[in-house]
Amino acid sequence: MIHTNLKKKFSCCVLVFLLFAVICVWKEKKKGSYYDSFKLQTKEFQVLKSLGKLAMGSDSQSVSSSSTQDPHRGRQTLGSLRGLAKAKPEASFQVWNKDSSSKNLIPRLQKIWKNYLSMNKYKVSYKGPGPGIKFSAEALRCHLRDHVNVSMVEVTDFPFNTSEWEGYLPKESIRTKAGPWGRCAVVSSAGSLKSSQLGREIDDHDAVLRFNGAPTANFQQDVGTKTTIRLMNSQLVTTEKRFLKDSLYNEGILIVWDPSVYHSDIPKWYQNPDYNFFNNYKTYRKLHPNQPFYILKPQMPWELWDILQEISPEEIQPNPPSSGMLGIIIMMTLCDQVDIYEFLPSKRKTDVCYYYQKFFDSACTMGAYHPLLYEKNLVKHLNQGTDEDIYLLGKATLPGFRTIHC
């Protein structure tokens, strides 16, 4: 009897000690990275499993010897230990928090954010609802579809209907060249795409959108080879020396965008572009007359910005949305489903800005000039994929506007 009681006490001590150790390890690891949190979960389960086996093994003799004196107590002890052994922590992945705010920025980026609020280069005077208006994911998709007009400058738009522009703009609407497609991929230029091995998956889509000067050569395994649309900012078209000659800019449909003063119409924007890319645009069209090359209407970025401000928890940078966010909305207009790669960071998250350059800055993930943090909040809210896809692949999945019913 004394021997049995000693065994019971020893088993209880071991149980308490191991549980205490698991809690300590969990608290310490909780401070670590996304990946450490995921590994800890697996280790916790293994420890609990071993703990259950150990407790069951050491108590089996105690239960059998004491069951003759108190059989009900023996069954109760055995049942509780089996329950412990079967317990599994639920799968969870630390991914982008859709309620992120400026409080999540490091001090340097907080200062930049405040500076842009005071600068207000584009003369933003938002008078809409918010900030902090709450939408369900379904309602927000409808709100975007109904209030953000994805359209290109046309030959009938002044001053593009003058003799100065005759023959330069594409005659066909982009809708006759692009889509409708089923599954589409939007491939960011993030440094975390390096070593992702996502190339084959990306190329498996019906259409692929890339940004600015992001290459595929030498990076095929990670980013694929297909380019259906390339969205470029006006700075690249104006200042990139290789733009007129590099074959990178001869593949797929090209779209250039340039920010205007807040909600300016086309004539006002034309008089005061952010970058005067018009001459280079014309030169390119002379060199490559058969290359589809469109100009995004300047109203669209600010229509999107208004919604970002409406739903965000605070004032956002009064600067236009990023090319990444514009590209996502463009593809939601043309596709039934849009898979977005490394816009929401995966476990490969890094301060390396681009997969094809060694340039380090946390602003490339969190945003500085563009309201990138709030754009990521929106995408996370709309995501129909899993947190596991975000964590492992950096993939968010959004439905196209044609597939939703409002």
From Swiss-Prot:
<feature type="topological domain" description="Cytoplasmic">
    <location>
        <begin position="1"/>
        <end position="9"/>
    </location>
</feature>
<feature type="glycosylation site" description="N-linked (GlcNAc...) asparagine">
    <location>
        <position position="161"/>
    </location>
</feature>
<dbReference type="InterPro" id="IPR038578">
    <property type="entry name" value="GT29-like_sf"/>
</dbReference>
<feature type="disulfide bond">
    <location>
        <begin position="142"/>
        <end position="406"/>
    </location>
</feature>
<keyword id="KW-0597">Phosphoprotein</keyword>
<feature type="binding site">
    <location>
        <position position="212"/>
    </location>
    <ligand>
        <name>substrate</name>
    </ligand>
</feature>
<dbReference type="GO" id="GO:0097503">
    <property type="term" value="P:sialylation"/>
</dbReference>
<dbReference type="GO" id="GO:0005576">
    <property type="term" value="C:extracellular region"/>
</dbReference>
<keyword id="KW-1133">Transmembrane helix</keyword>
<feature type="binding site">
    <location>
        <position position="233"/>
    </location>
    <ligand>
        <name>substrate</name>
    </ligand>
</feature>
<dbReference type="GO" id="GO:0006054">
    <property type="term" value="P:N-acetylneuraminate metabolic process"/>
</dbReference>
<feature type="topological domain" description="Lumenal">
    <location>
        <begin position="27"/>
        <end position="406"/>
    </location>
</feature>
<dbReference type="GO" id="GO:0005794">
    <property type="term" value="C:Golgi apparatus"/>
</dbReference>
<keyword id="KW-0808">Transferase</keyword>
<keyword id="KW-1015">Disulfide bond</keyword>
<comment type="subunit">
    <text>Monomer and homodimer.</text>
</comment>
<keyword id="KW-0812">Transmembrane</keyword>
<feature type="transmembrane region" description="Helical; Signal-anchor for type II membrane protein">
    <location>
        <begin position="10"/>
        <end position="26"/>
    </location>
</feature>
<feature type="disulfide bond">
    <location>
        <begin position="353"/>
        <end position="364"/>
    </location>
</feature>
<keyword id="KW-0735">Signal-anchor</keyword>
<dbReference type="GO" id="GO:0000139">
    <property type="term" value="C:Golgi membrane"/>
</dbReference>
<feature type="binding site">
    <location>
        <position position="354"/>
    </location>
    <ligand>
        <name>substrate</name>
    </ligand>
</feature>
<feature type="binding site">
    <location>
        <position position="353"/>
    </location>
    <ligand>
        <name>substrate</name>
    </ligand>
</feature>
<feature type="binding site">
    <location>
        <begin position="322"/>
        <end position="324"/>
    </location>
    <ligand>
        <name>substrate</name>
    </ligand>
</feature>
<feature type="binding site">
    <location>
        <position position="370"/>
    </location>
    <ligand>
        <name>substrate</name>
    </ligand>
</feature>
<feature type="modified residue" description="Phosphotyrosine">
    <location>
        <position position="369"/>
    </location>
</feature>
<protein>
    <recommendedName>
        <fullName>Beta-galactoside alpha-2,6-sialyltransferase 1</fullName>
        <ecNumber>2.4.3.1</ecNumber>
    </recommendedName>
</protein>
<keyword id="KW-0325">Glycoprotein</keyword>
<comment type="similarity">
    <text>Belongs to the glycosyltransferase 29 family.</text>
</comment>
<dbReference type="GO" id="GO:0016266">
    <property type="term" value="P:O-glycan processing"/>
</dbReference>
<dbReference type="GO" id="GO:0032580">
    <property type="term" value="C:Golgi cisterna membrane"/>
</dbReference>
<feature type="binding site">
    <location>
        <position position="365"/>
    </location>
    <ligand>
        <name>substrate</name>
    </ligand>
</feature>
<comment type="function">
    <text>Transfers sialic acid from CMP-sialic acid to galactose-containing acceptor substrates. In B lymphocytes, generates neuraminidase-sensitive lymphocyte cell-surface differentiation antigens, such as CDw75, HB-6 and CD76.</text>
</comment>
<dbReference type="InterPro" id="IPR001675">
    <property type="entry name" value="Glyco_trans_29"/>
</dbReference>
<comment type="pathway">
    <text>Protein modification; protein glycosylation.</text>
</comment>
<keyword id="KW-0964">Secreted</keyword>
<dbReference type="GO" id="GO:0019082">
    <property type="term" value="P:viral protein processing"/>
</dbReference>
<feature type="binding site">
    <location>
        <position position="376"/>
    </location>
    <ligand>
        <name>substrate</name>
    </ligand>
</feature>
<dbReference type="GO" id="GO:0003835">
    <property type="term" value="F:beta-galactoside alpha-2,6-sialyltransferase activity"/>
</dbReference>
<dbReference type="InterPro" id="IPR012163">
    <property type="entry name" value="Sialyl_trans"/>
</dbReference>
<keyword id="KW-0328">Glycosyltransferase</keyword>
<dbReference type="GO" id="GO:0018279">
    <property type="term" value="P:protein N-linked glycosylation via asparagine"/>
</dbReference>
